[in-house]
């Protein structure tokens, strides 16, 4: 065995161990302190959102009109510090949530948590809006601008510049976990979804023995087809052409694509609701009945009524976070680049 093969095997083993550790860590964090109590992450996310909402006077309602005016460009000033307009900063953040997170995330919540999980997704979204308001405002307030005029912000800068240098270790920890998270929820899931969908269609079109769809083994650990590799190369090339231009190029591209994605998503949802208008009220009944109903059919929720309710709540909050990123902190990194001298304006956006 030469050095190249040894390196590939070592990389494959390390990747597998990191994946296994990441899955176990993810499940442990979300189920802590125990599977028969309300998980700490649910209390932290929803509880903090409720406290901030009440303490700040329901900003998601109070500043809604102002946020729309800011996003429309009413207060744009090209001389303000920053890299992107308010609209571009918003679309950059939205590009990470519109699509897989809103569609696959909701479907997963329904499958594992039952109809009642949608209620907890609504709760997470409503109170999570205040968390986004706070984290985006703070990220603009405590961002840094280098000598070339480019901005750098996010929760890591908020922690270090707002809480003091003694908390720099926490800022570094957040940045590290954010990088790890970006590989999974920010890239791997979307790439896999695109590749898997194209592969499924190609499999029906060409069959399993075609050179594009035939599975090949890699070190007896992974199996993939030539088309899946090709999909990855094309996606990497397209993304590379965008990100090589920096945050301004990203903002320009998302400024065009994100609104199209959002319009298609909303129109599709409305058309589905119109087509199934006779089932809308019964769907609402299922959702509210499944919130605290211990007889709801929930996958993997053995252990009685309490476990069923906790699983429904947990899946709703988990997928709610994945769908809107409220409280995660990643959206604030994009919003911190907005051109404004008034941090609260970007918070309202």
Residues covered by each model-derived region:
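Membrane-interfacial loop-to-helix junctions in multi-pass transporters
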Residues: 36-41, 75-83, 115-116, 164-171, ...
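Helix-loop-helix module between adjacent transmembrane segments
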Residues: 52-53, 94-95, 124-149, 156, ...
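Transmembrane helix-loop boundary segments of multi-pass membrane transporters
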Residues: 27-37, 108-125, 189-196, 210-224, ...
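Hydrophobic alpha-helical segments of integral membrane proteins
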Residues: 25-36, 60, 64-72, 155-158, ...
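Membrane-embedded translocation segments of transport machinery
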Residues: 244-248, 252-255, 260-331, 335-336, ...
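Alpha-helical membrane segments and immediately flanking helix-loop junctions
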Residues: 79-111, 138-162, 169, 173-176, ...
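N-terminal alpha-helical transmembrane segments of multi-pass membrane transport
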Residues: 1-100, 110-117, 128
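Membrane-interface loop-to-helix entry segments
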Residues: 44-68, 192-198, 227-289
């Amino acid at each position: 065995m030469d050095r190249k093969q040894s390196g590939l095997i070592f990389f494959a083993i390390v990747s597998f161990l990191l994946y296994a550790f990441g899955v176990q860590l993810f499940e442990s964090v979300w189920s802590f302190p125990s599977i028969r109590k309300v998980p700490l992450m649910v209390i932290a996310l929803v509880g903090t959102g409720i406290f901030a909402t009440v303490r700040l006077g329901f900003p998601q309602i109070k500043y809604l009109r102002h946020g729309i005016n800011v996003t429309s460009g009413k207060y744009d000033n090209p001389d303000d510090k920053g890299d992107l307009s308010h609209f571009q900063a918003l679309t950059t953040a939205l590009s990470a949530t519109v699509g897989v997170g809103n569609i696959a995330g909701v479907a997963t919540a329904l499958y594992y948590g039952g109809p009642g999980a949608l209620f907890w997704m609504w709760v997470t979204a409503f109170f999570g809006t205040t968390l986004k308001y706070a984290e985006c405002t703070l990220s603009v307030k405590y961002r840094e601008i280098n000598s070339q005029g480019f901005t750098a912000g996010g929760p890591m800068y908020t922690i270090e510049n707002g809480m003091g240098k003694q908390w720099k270790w926490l800022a570094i920890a957040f940045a590290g976990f954010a990088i790890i998270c970006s590989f999974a929820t920010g890239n791997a899931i979307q790439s896999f979804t695109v590749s898997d969908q194209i592969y499924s269609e190609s499999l029906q079109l060409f069959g399993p023995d075609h050179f594009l769809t035939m599975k090949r083994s890699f070190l007896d650990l992974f199996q993939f087809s030539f088309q899946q590799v090709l999909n990855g190369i094309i996606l990497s090339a397209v993304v590379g052409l965008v990100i090589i231009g920096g945050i301004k190029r990203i903002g320009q591209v998302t400024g065009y694509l994100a609104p199209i994605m959002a319009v298609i998503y909303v129109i599709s949802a409305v058309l589905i609701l119109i087509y199934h208008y006779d089932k809308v009220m019964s769907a609402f009944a299922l959702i509210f009945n499944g919130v605290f109903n211990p007889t709801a059919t929930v996958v993997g929720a053995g252990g009685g009524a309490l476990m069923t309710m906790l699983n429904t709540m947990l899946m709703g909050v988990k997928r709610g976070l994945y769908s809107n990123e409220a409280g995660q902190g990643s959206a604030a990194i994009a919003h911190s680049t907005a051109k404004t001298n008034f941090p609260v304006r970007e918070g309202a956006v």
